[in-house]
Amino acid sequence: AESGCALWVYEAGSGIRTAISLGELSDGSISLFFGDLSGKVYSINPNTGQKNWAIQGDDHDHARITGTPVYYDNRLYVPLSSLEEVAGAMPDYECCTFRGGLLSVDAQTGETIWKTYTVAEPTKQGKNKLGVQIWAPNGAAIWTAPTLDPETRTIYAVTGDSYSHPAAPESDAVMAFDMDTGDIKW
């Protein structure tokens, strides 16, 4: 660090748009956390650049992590987003089935503690002019880092737009989640 030279480089599987969070784990070690454009979440050793773990935040083909994961008390809170809206602009694409969400992960192991979606499971809503299925509700991705209030055990997150009609009331909204269970408070 004194020389200004890079000590290590980590090659993630996809582009990175999040900032990096740093946290002290329950075993006393330090870890760096970030997400990538393939929807993966990473824990990296800051001294060696070695991967501690990597998980897929969501299994949807268009899932992305664009908001910075937030570390608190050996938990990582990860906002879930997507680029399905871009695919949905194609008239032959069945738009859209991605649902935004928030993921709680054990920062030491990468194991999922809970995952909460911002909208209900999409259902068939009719067809477009080409006869291609349209689904809703969808979207309401969480694009940015959530805000934690440890005193009230609440996580606040802002959601993006719905990808098709009818729009979900949870889209373009501020939502509150229980830090311990992931339950939606409002």
Where are these regions (language model features)?
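Glycine-rich active-site/cofactor-binding loop and its immediate structural neighborhood
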Residues: 1-7, 35, 43-44
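Inter-blade boundary loops/turns of WD-repeat beta-propellers
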Residues: 1-2, 25, 46, 107, ...
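A generic secondary-structure signal for well-formed alpha-helical elements
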Residues: 48, 80, 84, 106-109, ...
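Beta-propeller blade signature
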Residues: 44-45, 97-111, 170-183
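Accessory beta-strand-rich segments of carbohydrate-active enzymes
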Residues: 39-40, 45, 49-51
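Aromatic (tryptophan-biased) beta-strands that constitute blades/sheets of beta-rich domains
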Residues: 3-12, 50-59, 111-135, 183-186
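Repeat-blade elements of multi-bladed beta-propeller folds
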Residues: 13-41, 64-94, 99-102, 133-167, ...
